[in-house]
Amino acid sequence: MKIMGLDPGLNCTGWSILSVSKDIKLIDKGTVVTNSKEDTGQRLRKIHTDVLDILRLYQVDSASMEEIFINKNPKSSISLCYARGILLLTLSTKDIPVFEYSTNYVKKSITGNGHAKKEQVSFMIEKILNVKCSGTYDISDSIAVALCHAYSKKSF
C-alpha cells in the first residue's frame, strides 16, 4: 500500500510517499513551491497540477494530512484553507481517500509526546525510517502525518 502525506501551504506544500507492507519505506518526498508574485488562482493551479503528476507517478492508495487549525493570523489561515481545499479536490478527482489527524495526535504517534517540537518529530522520523530529513519542515511534517496514518491503520 502507498500512502501520500501532505503538509498544505500556499507558499510551500510538503509531500511524501510511503510504501507500507511488512515494513514502512520512504519512497520519495518533496515540496511544491509557488511564486508569491502570482495570483492565488495560478498558485493553486500549480499545487493541483504538481500533485496530480505525483499521483500519476506513484499510484497512491490513500492520503493523509493534519486537521485544519486556525492561526492567530487570519490571512495565513485563509491561505492554508485554499491549499487544503485544492488538495482535497485533487485527491477526490482520483478517488483517493483522505485521512485527517490532529497535530497533537500526529506528534504523539511519532514521538510519544503530543506537544513535541518539530525538531523532535524530524529526529524520530530519521530513526524510524533510517533516512535523513533534509529540507524543510514541510517535508518532515508530511512524512509524519503519513507515518501516523500507517500506524493508525496498522497496515504493516
From Swiss-Prot:
It catalyses: Endonucleolytic cleavage at a junction such as a reciprocal single-stranded crossover between two homologous DNA duplexes (Holliday junction). InterPro entries: RNaseH-like_sf (IPR012337), RNaseH_sf (IPR036397), X-over_junc_endoDNase_RuvC (IPR002176). Binds 2 Mg(2+) ion per subunit. It holds the Pfam family RuvC. Mg(2+) 2 binds at E66. One of its GO terms (cellular component) is Holliday junction resolvase complex. Keywords: Cytoplasm, DNA damage, DNA recombination, DNA repair, DNA-binding, Endonuclease, Hydrolase, Magnesium, Metal-binding, Nuclease. Its main location: cytoplasm. Its EC number is 3.1.21.10. The RuvA-RuvB-RuvC complex processes Holliday junction (HJ) DNA during genetic recombination and DNA repair. Endonuclease that resolves HJ intermediates. Cleaves cruciform DNA by making single-stranded nicks across the HJ at symmetrical positions within the homologous arms, yielding a 5'-phosphate and a 3'-hydroxyl group; requires a central core of homology in the junction. The consensus cleavage sequence is 5'-(A/T)TT(C/G)-3'. Cleavage occurs on the 3'-side of the TT dinucleotide at the point of strand exchange. Homodimer which binds Holliday junction (HJ) DNA. The HJ becomes 2-fold symmetrical on binding to RuvC with unstacked arms; it has a different conformation from HJ DNA in complex with RuvA. In the full resolvosome a probable DNA-RuvA(4)-RuvB(12)-RuvC(2) complex forms which resolves the HJ. This is Crossover junction endodeoxyribonuclease RuvC. It comes from Ehrlichia chaffeensis (strain ATCC CRL-10679 / Arkansas).
